[in-house]
């Protein structure tokens, strides 16, 4: 979702609208710039996909924390009295998620002990509980092996439950212009790829 910027969780840019759009998705495909090109300026002045990922992660986590805090406030009194078992279970689930978010991690890092806990967590539709795939947009020279930006991102997400795929958008646009399957296969073979990035996605 283009246009999501630092401060979106507080309404910066078109923040709340973008965050609402993300809430409606089944998964997040996060495209990150992983190439240098002096003709294409970066909004933060320097290419750093790890920083870019962390900015978006933080905005999503802050929005989820806002959601969790509101839910905790709603059920806390009932849970403390102890008469309402559903409220107590919900309070425990919300508290577990809150703890993870406060550590700067995503809700998908939380593991639950029962189907009931999983159900309560799913019903929150948290932004950071969605599956995520990071798409590294690289230059043509890095389409096969990746580059140092891709390596840095791989290191940054190694403990996340996330996928990384390397794509050269420029090559993908060239592939899209090729008419026949045979010509596409020949083109891919010439640049050392088995299949297009779109096919891998």
Predicted features along the sequence, with ranges:
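Structural and coupling elements of P-loop NTPases
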Residues: 1-201
